[in-house]
């Protein structure tokens, strides 16, 4: 009962599978769309805004960073050739949905502030396993760094950003000794983790694993919380105010684990949810936007580098 009360979840009569929750409750906790009126409305907005980004800004679309048909990225060049930072965006979708077509919407605000942007596509479950997905993200980073001069960004200013499942994959890319793909852990200037899952054991026990097919060992191997090294690059860890209790718990655990290892900026955007939080990337005057711009060394972002909570774009100590 104590775990359920701590989570703010109603006690249930079914067999408990994780922290006092039955399978149906756990499934709801790992279904972020349970907290919003319409997931489809967000997905349509992602697609519409991403199409506008490609229409209104120069882009090198469909660049192959690896041999798999899904290993493609779209590159939006920044204004300061050879010197600008790069934000690499890894989309969400529960490791089984979305792609480049819906994921360029953060680019315009970041481009306006002087960054280049790369939008990554990767293989999805059930066709591609989680180890291989993580390897693809690593290969994308490795490819971008090897082609930095040609693309026109500063390789020592590459920042990796992911949302939801993409936050998990971005966090995994920070870890040394990968199971798949090149080790790029020491080559990333900073990371931005939005509404992520960092311990996959509850995911393994939920409906999400119907596609992921993780066993206990695979869940642990792919859980960044269990493998964090002693030192990491600076990290912005953010979530919306309207997240499920389990997503909030995952966020809190990651923040606690990162504090002794790196400089961390925590952002809680009280009026944002799991799906609209990424809209604030690069947007001045929002907690997330200011934190990311400050970490990337762009402009005179108004928020200092520390913990933050605000209303629409959120932060506080």
Where are the regions a protein language model picked out?
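Alpha/beta-hydrolase
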Residues: 90, 194, 269-272
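N-terminal cap/lid segment of alpha/beta-hydrolase-fold proteins
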Residues: 29-81
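C-terminal catalytic histidine-bearing segment of alpha/beta-hydrolase fold enzymes
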Residues: 248, 252, 259-300, 311-317
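Primarily recognizes the serine-hydrolase "nucleophile elbow" in alpha/beta-hydrolase
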Residues: 139-207
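The feature captures the conserved acid-bearing segment of alpha/beta-hydrolase catalytic domains
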Residues: 184-185, 190, 196-204, 216-252
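Short beta-strand element of the alpha/beta-hydrolase
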Residues: 83-93
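Short amphipathic alpha-helix adjacent to the substrate-entry channel of hydrolases
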Residues: 101-119
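Hydrophobic beta-strand anchors of alpha/beta hydrolase catalytic cores
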Residues: 87-89, 117, 235
